[in-house]
Amino acid sequence: MGIKKFRPTSPGVRQMTVSTFEEITKVDPEKSLLTPLSKSGGRNAHGKITVRHRGGGLKRHYRIIDFKRNKDDIPAKVASVEYDPNRTANIALLHYVDGEKRYIIAPKGLKVGEMIFSGPESDIKVGNALPLINIPVGTIIHNIEMKPGKGGQIARSAGNSAQLMAKEGRYALVRLPSGEVRQILIECRATIGQVGNLDHENVTIGKAGRKRKMGIRPTVRGSAMNPNDHPHGGGEGRSPIGRPSPVTPWGKPALGYKTRKKNKHSDKFIVTGRKR
């Protein structure tokens, strides 16, 4: 999928780029796989903001995605590759021979008309889903389960992939997109190949209006606020923050502060930490 640039007819489009959507083969989604999607505006059940800079945006329907890939030994034909506004990756519509339809994350190289399978006996082919125990070492994979039967949770965004490094007893060693090497149960499933839409990272938003359509509101600098709103606020003119290092609106260190819980139960499954 390529990137389209524009002539600088206005300041907004001078730097803006968009995807050419060459991989998309169908515009209208499958209605039976749509569900309403309500917006929270970053508020919790009490109406308090728990995530800042959220609100507005265009209306969307949620596409029900099959992350579990548990329909074993039944052939499925790739009917179309579609755009999904809820994620960076594209999605592929599968028509199973028994009449059922499902969406999956579209991997790189998946073509309309191909037949794909799920299950331990499936071939090592792009789009097929197998348990890690049945996948050869060195294979590029995505949509990886953390717990058997729970559904894929790792390597699902555009261009992402992981690699199966080794198998040791009950666990497989998988190198994640972050560079972390982690133990995962060999019964967990993964899909062969790399997630498609690789050029997503090269898209330049270009103007604030596109961010607003995505449901993202402006981020105000703390130094532009009053002292009762932010630790960086106040002062005459453009004042320094008056602290050794920047902090969050709640006074926590803002840069390089580790937020992962210490002594977390899953730490024992991390063989090599992620790149920093």
Swiss-Prot record:
Q: Which keywords has UniProt assigned to this entry?
A: Ribonucleoprotein, Ribosomal protein, RNA-binding, rRNA-binding
- Gene Ontology CC annotation, any one: large ribosomal subunit
Under Gene3D superfamilies, the record lists:
2.30.30.30, Nucleic acid-binding proteins (2.40.50.140), Ribosomal protein L2, domain 3 (4.10.950.10)
Query: What are the GO BP annotations of this UniProt entry?
Result: cytoplasmic translation
Q: Which domain of life is it from?
A: Bacteria
HAMAP family per UniProt = Ribosomal_uL2_B
Q: Which family does it belong to?
A: Belongs to the universal ribosomal protein uL2 family.
Q: What is this protein called?
A: Large ribosomal subunit protein uL2
What species is this protein from? Alkaliphilus metalliredigens (strain QYMF)
Q: Which gene encodes it?
A: rplB
